[in-house]
Every structure is written in C-alpha cells, then in structure tokens.
Amino acid sequence: MQREPLSPENDALWRRLWEIWQDNDEEDVVLDSLILDELEDEIPELRDRTKTALAYLQRARYIQYRSGVGEDGLEPILFDVYEPR
C-alpha cells in the first residue's frame, strides 16, 4: 500500500502515537485532553491542530481511531497504528 509522504510534524505525531499505542500493549487508547496537550507540547507545530492532524493521518491510512465519550465529552479513541518504518 503506497501512502503519501507526511509533513515533519505529522510524521512526528504518527511515530509518537505508535509509541503510545505500543506502551498500551496495542489496546485502545483514549486521547483525552491531557494526552493531546502533551502531544502539542512535544510537537509545537501542531498547536490547536492536533485533531485535524489525527483526521489526516486516518484518511492517509497511518492510524485508525473513532470518537467515543470520555470525561471531557467526545474524545478520539486510537485503536490501530500502522508501524513506522
């Protein structure tokens, strides 16, 4: 499967999501506001654009997530991340 190349910030997000998902033994991960804030601190270019970047990564077939109800309302739930090479 050929995927389009990612911008540096989207690539950094994808690789970080892979680490988070692996640390959770490939189980679903709720990306609550705390995790999203941490990601924005780690990747400042994504500030206020993290959810847009998640949607892009899903459309480009790098990750899979769904929306679910969490403590802060609707939150993305990461359930698959394709391994970075």
Q: What is each PLM-predicted segment?
A:
Residues N24-D41:
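Short acidic, hydrophobic short linear motifs in intrinsically disordered regions
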Residues P44-R59:
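Short amphipathic alpha-helical interaction segments
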Residues L6, D28, L46:
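Residue-level marker of regulatory loop/turn positions in helix-turn-helix DNA-binding domains and
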Residues A12, L34, T52-A53:
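Amphipathic alpha-helical interaction segments
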Residues G68-R85:
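Short, cationic-aromatic polyanion-contact patches
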Residues M1-D25:
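Short alpha-helical segments that sit at the start of domains
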Residues Q58-G68:
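A short, conserved structural fragment
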